[in-house]
């Protein structure tokens, strides 16, 4: 039915144009695919082709094109009006039938669907409300009963009542259970919400109480505490270092005061003996022989006691330096017989242990041989002044065994900064004790020759007979040395040539030493350990010297410190030493004339030191002032090699009044500012004994601090102890 409706609808909606002529269709013809053509057009097309022009479907006599009934054609006007009316009527009837059949089919389908819908609704009701179902069933039962009241049975009614009662009970129970379940469900929902909130709270609390979070806080707190403890430890270490330094300074001051007190006591005792010795005059030279021998023996015992604490190479070398002065004194003695008549023999005891030249002179006077002085080499202690601090040996240099014959090391041993203490250099370091014993005689002879050449010139120019100047200037060349020999009168030219050549060699060695001062790290560590051991050894030696030979130790400490805090103590300290040196050297010089003594009435002291070429430029304006009441000064030449600082009043005056005047009124030794600022790299071993008080104290304090700082920085054992 629907198929026919579609066909009818298609027929009513056929196109009205031809596919071939594209005009209004006349006598329409349809192919199998319902393509409309004009009958005339398709006939012409089929003459040449056997396919549909639109879809290429073959058009054969078995499958021809079909004509449409009721289509407009040329023959229509030929039909009558009644015929056309009947044709239209037949077409409408056909269409009406088709539509009616289709309407009937649709109505049947609607009825079937309604019945199915009712059945489904009834099923839903029975499922959702069983009571209504029961009531519905009862109503259905009542209707038949009502219809058939005669057929109702009382037994069935009772049975149905029982069923109804049981059903009601079940319903009530189920209803109560449903209510309880609803309440339980509400409670569970509330509990679930509370548990969810508790769970969230616990999660947040766990996050807040995580060990990592508190661990970070704990680590930060511990780190801050550790840093605080480290800062406190560093502060305490610094405070401990400062306290150690302060304690060391106090100990050094205490030792300094002890030495100064001992020196004052010794100087007072010496000054009490000095006026009595001066009052005897030159005629008492024969009577002073036994006291001199006694003082010499006492000094020898003190020197041997203090020398036992030093190393054997240093003691033998220092004794050799004493023997050098013996030879230099013996060389100049025959040239000055007038000194023996004019000046008495030496009568004053000396402050240091340098008694070898005096003993040599006495032995030569009494007919002794120089060979008798040989045993003194092992017992004598060379009079090098000890430091005022326990670190006097900390300035020693550590020399390698192969450098023991190098003159550079020997020249460097005499170098000394102006405000530093003296330095000792142990020149002899042998690989074995046998080698030291084998080479000892050779080294002694070589050292005697060198030192005699170096120090002989100091004896030659000690005093000058000229009234205008009391100091002599020695040049480095041989010509000026000869001029000095002519002015003095009895100095051989060979001695000055030797001194000039020796000094030039020593100065060149000093320059090479300054260029080779670089050290490796291993040598620096060895030097640090050596300085540490030397400081310990020096403290032991100072204790032993104080216990065994207090007199000698006091003299040596006074000699290093120079003048004490009072100027009178300084003059008394320097006076006997000048008397000793004068008594030792006055026999080797011509006698001073009376004109030389009375020329200006001024005492013009000079210093005894050794100058390097670098220091000649610094000492061009070097001047030595006279005593405080003279007011005049004397300028020394820049090429001065040896200048000896002694007072003529100390050597020539024998009256007690002059000694008292020197004791209380005059300052015999004053050095200008140029002398104080001058730093001579080479000095004589006894030149530091005549340094002024202020310079000595400043030098001792600065040297103490420098030695302590160097030991604290360089010594590993010192660092570990601190």
UniProtKB/Swiss-Prot annotation:
Pfam families for this protein: zf-C3HC4_2
Group of enzyme by EC: transferase
Any GO BP annotation: protein autoubiquitination
One Gene Ontology molecular-function label: zinc ion binding
Spans annotated as Disordered: 273-359, 541-585, 691-722
Its EC number(s): 2.3.2.27
Stored InterPro entries: OBI1, OBI1_RING-HC, Znf_RING, Znf_RING/FYVE/PHD
Coiled-coil regions listed: 87-129, 157-267
Compositionally biased tracts (Low complexity): 302-319
Cited Gene3D superfamilies: Zinc/RING finger domain, C3HC4 (zinc finger)
Swiss-Prot/TrEMBL keywords: Chromosome, Coiled coil, Metal-binding, Phosphoprotein, Transferase, Ubl conjugation, Ubl conjugation pathway, Zinc, Zinc-finger
Residues with the Phosphoserine modification: 210, 522, 549, 557, 564, 566, 715, 717
Cellular compartments per GO CC: chromatin
Subcellular location per the Swiss-Prot or TrEMBL entry: Chromosome
Purpose: E3 ubiquitin ligase essential for DNA replication origin activation during S phase. Acts as a replication origin selector which selects the origins to be fired and catalyzes the multi-mono-ubiquitination of a subset of chromatin-bound ORC3 and ORC5 during S-phase.
Subunit structure: Associates with ORC complex. Binds to chromatin; association is cell cycle-regulated, absent from mitotic chromosomes, is associated with chromatin from G1 and partially released from chromatin from mid S-phase.
Protein's recorded name: ORC ubiquitin ligase 1
């Amino acid at each position: 039915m629907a198929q026919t409706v579609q066909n009818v609808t298609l027929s009513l909606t056929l196109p009205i144009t031809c596919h071939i002529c594209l005009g209004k269709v006349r006598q329409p013809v349809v192919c199998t695919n319902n393509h409309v053509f004009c009958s005339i057009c398709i006939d012409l097309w089929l003459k040449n082709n056997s396919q549909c022009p639109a879809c290429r479907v073959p058009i054969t006599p078995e499958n021809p094109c079909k004509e449409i009934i009721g289509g407009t054609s040329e023959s229509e006007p030929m039909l009558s009006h009644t015929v056309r009316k009947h044709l239209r009527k037949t077409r409408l009837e056909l269409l009406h039938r088709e539509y009616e059949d289709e309407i009937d089919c649709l109505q049947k389908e609607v009825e079937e669907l309604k019945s199915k819908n009712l059945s489904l609704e009834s099923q839903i009701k029975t499922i959702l409300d069983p009571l209504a179902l029961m009531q519905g069933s009862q109503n259905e039962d009542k209707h038949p009963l009502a219809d058939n009241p005669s057929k109702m049975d009382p037994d069935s009614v009772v049975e149905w009542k029982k069923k109804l009662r049981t059903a009601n009970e079940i319903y009530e129970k189920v209803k109560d259970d449903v209510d309880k379940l609803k309440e339980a469900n509400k409670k569970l929902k509330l509990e679930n919400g509370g548990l969810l909130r508790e769970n969230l709270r616990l999660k947040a609390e766990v996050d807040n109480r995580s060990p990592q979070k508190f661990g970070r806080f704990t680590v930060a707190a511990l780190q801050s505490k550790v840093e605080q403890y480290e800062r406190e430890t560093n502060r305490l270490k610094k405070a401990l270092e400062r306290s150690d330094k302060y304690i060391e300074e106090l100990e050094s001051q205490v030792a300094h005061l002890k030495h100064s007190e001992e020196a004052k006591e010794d100087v007072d005792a010496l000054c009490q003996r000095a006026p009595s010795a001066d009052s005897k005059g030159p005629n008492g030279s024969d009577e002073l022989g036994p006291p001199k021998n006694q003082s010499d023996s006492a000094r020898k015992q003190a020197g041997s006691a203090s020398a036992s604490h030093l190393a054997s190479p240093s003691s033998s070398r220092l004794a050799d330096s004493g023997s050098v002065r013996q030879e230099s004194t013996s060389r100049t003695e025959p040239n000055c017989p007038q000194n023996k008549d004019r000046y008495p023999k030496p009568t004053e005891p000396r402050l240091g242990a340098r008694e070898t030249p005096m003993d040599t002179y006495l032995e030569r006077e009494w007919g002794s041989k120089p060979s008798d002085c040989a045993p003194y080499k092992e017992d004598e202690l060379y009079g090098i002044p000890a430091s005022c601090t326990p670190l006097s040996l900390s300035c020693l240099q550590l020399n390698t065994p192969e450098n023991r014959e190098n003159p550079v090391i020997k020249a460097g041993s005499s170098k000394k900064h102006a405000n530093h203490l003296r330095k000792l250099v142990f020149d002899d370091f042998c690989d074995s004790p046998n080698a030291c014993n084998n080479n000892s005689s050779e080294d002694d002879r070589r050292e005697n020759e060198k030192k005699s050449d170096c120090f002989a010139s100091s004896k030659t120019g000690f005093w000058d007979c000229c009234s205008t100047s009391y100091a002599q200037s020695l040049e480095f060349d041989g010509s000026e040395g000869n001029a000095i020999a002519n002015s003095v009168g009895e100095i051989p030219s060979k001695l000055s040539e030797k001194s000039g050549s020796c000094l030039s060699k020593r100065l060149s060695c000093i320059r090479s030493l300054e260029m080779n001062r670089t050290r490796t790290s291993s040598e620096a560590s060895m030097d640090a350990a050596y300085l540490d051991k030397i400081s310990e050894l020096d403290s032991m030696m100072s204790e032993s010297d104080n216990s065994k030979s207090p007199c000698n130790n006091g003299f040596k400490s006074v000699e290093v410190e120079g003048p004490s805090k009072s100027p009178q103590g300084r003059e008394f300290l320097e006076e006997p030493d000048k008397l000793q040196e004068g008594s030792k050297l006055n026999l080797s010089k011509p006698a001073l004339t009376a004109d030389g003594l009375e020329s200006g009435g001024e005492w013009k002291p000079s210093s005894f030191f050794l100058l390097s070429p670098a220091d000649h430029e610094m000492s061009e304006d070097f001047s030595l002032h006279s005593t405080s009441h003279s007011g005049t000064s004397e300028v020394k030449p820049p090429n001065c090699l040896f200048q000896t600082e002694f007072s003529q009043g100390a050597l020539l005056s024998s009256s007690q009044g002059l000694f008292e005047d020197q004791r209380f009124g005059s300052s015999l030794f004053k050095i200008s500012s140029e002398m104080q600022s001058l730093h001579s790299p080479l000095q004589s071993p006894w030149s530091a004994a005549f340094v002024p008080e202020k310079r000595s104290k400043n030098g001792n304090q600065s040297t103490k601090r420098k030695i302590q700082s160097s030991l604290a920085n360089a010594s590993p054992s010192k660092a570990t102890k601190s």
